[in-house]
Amino acid sequence: MRRYLQQGRGKLVGHRGRQGALVGFAATVLYLLTMDRSVSWWDCGEFIATGHLLQVGHPPGAPLYQLLQHLFTLFSFGNPMLVAPLSNALSAVAAGITVGILYLTMRELRVSWRGALVGAACYALCDTVWFSAVESEVYALAMLFCAADVWLMLRWRRTGDARMLPLVGLMLGLGVCTHLMTLLVIPALGLIYLSGRRMARTKPYVFIFAFFFFFIGLTPYAIIPIRAAADPPINEMRGSFESYLKREQYAKAPLYPRMWRERDREHWREWTFSDHGLAANAAYYITYQLGFMYGRYLMYNFIGRENEHWNIVVLYILPALLALWGLARHRRRSRWDFWIVMALFLMGGIILNLYLNHPCYEPRSRDYVYVLSLYALAVWIGIGADEVGGKWKTVILIAAPLTLLAGNWSDHDRSRCHSVHDIALNHLQSCDRNAVLITLGDNDTFPLWYLQQVERRRTDVEVYNVGLTGWSETMDIIASNMGHRPVYFSQYFVDRYADYFPGRLRCEGFCWRLVSTAGEAGDLEPMRRHIRDSIEWHITPHEYLPRVSRNFLRDWEQNTASIK
């Protein structure tokens, strides 16, 4: 037994480690080749701007991610056009390392190298993972810490090396400084400890060190109040540091009722038979929250989805069949290992879904929050690949990742995607000099922050997001600037609040100008001028257009349809 425990002690890089490094390197190359070369939608523009200049982003913050972003973007050497690619490269590298660690984790779970390779490849090529790996978001780095924690605990179980536990504590703390989803691995870590406590005996003081290193891992959070005190241009810490960490500016969803957001009442009946009562809430949870907001995402990744660009239905059900076969066979292999992987799957999926209590409807897909459950499914894919027999085994194992690669390549290769950058720039270009631009959501705000803060484009335009400044303060800003400076609204703002300004909105390019009279609103010359002189586009053949880009361009076409 002692010889088994000491097997591989102190050797973090052996033959198996080199295999994992090769798998991780291949995944990293794939992500670097297909990553976005500029800003992307949603939080990416905010993360690039706050990371590059060490500003304060939305609660509860991601200080370690921002510090690493800042480190990566230092290699731009003052070239602002390299900042976004370098920031995106952080996600690509983190996701690639995660794939390598997944391979090593499956080897620790006694999966053959062939099965581990198939499982790691299917994880690397699935929709959600690939999407997060090619843009500036926190989830790739957060999954790296989740994967590292599980792998290190499994190494501790096999080798009995007490040094692994403080390292697990450190990784857990650093993961919290990236995203709180890292805490979801704690039940699995506990099961690994219970399964190995008799073979890998550890003295009590080691656990004290592990807790100490966990708190050391939390120290990057100190940068949030320090930078907030410097009052940078982007500072989303309102009030105290405690309220920032608690995300008090956001609405909190209760565990019950499941139908809780009153403004969604008209949509509840689409998913259940009533808008109140325990039975109706249970039906809503099963149909919408568990089915539409979780089960649908699992099928997107391992069964199939409609390709958003070419409008072709591509089915790749083979990975899902391997996962189901691996799930069925895993418990026969090892009861402890089965429940360890099941803990990852449940905590990263069903239990997380229960906690989040998704409102009806979300403004965007939320598949990225369930990436830990996809990680667990990838382990079962590897085990399923191990258990496949017969003369078709080689064909099946090769076909599983290849179908994912073929199905996902077209809408995950963002190396030629410039639509986000161009649409954001055209918002700024649609404004006259020294204008005030009022925006509403993430997609008409964060890419503009990136352009102004990083590329220093149209810094004369002041951008105010009504969700951050508040309605009352926004009205004060409009009133104080009207007649002195041009005031513009984004399309998102106009869609929701146009009724507050009847007859006073004139379309100019991608924005709407607030004018004094209805007569001015009917003047089409400013629109023609912007189309002729201000609007800029990259001419990129075969560029993939994300759904948000298509929606913006659809609105643009509708606004310009009357101008010939």
Predicted features and spans:
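Extracytoplasmic catalytic/substrate-binding loops of multi-pass membrane glycan-assembly enzymes
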Residues: 35-47, 57-69, 290, 415-419
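Loop-to-helix entry region of an early transmembrane alpha helix in multi-pass inner-membrane enzymes
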Residues: 63, 67, 77-100, 132, ...
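ER/secretory pathway lumenal C-terminal domains and tails of membrane proteins involved
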Residues: 92, 135-136, 140-143, 155-163, ...
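Transmembrane-helix signature of polytopic, membrane-embedded enzymes
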Residues: 17-20, 102-125, 334-343, 347, ...
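Transmembrane-helix motifs of polytopic, lipid-linked glycan transferases
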Residues: 89-110, 148-152, 321-326
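Short hydrophobic/aromatic helix or loop-helix immediately within or flanking a transmembrane segment
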Residues: 50-80, 92-93, 293-302
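Membrane-interface interhelical loops and short amphipathic "cap" helices
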Residues: 41-50, 76-82, 128, 356-366, ...
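N-terminal membrane topogenic signal
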Residues: 8-22
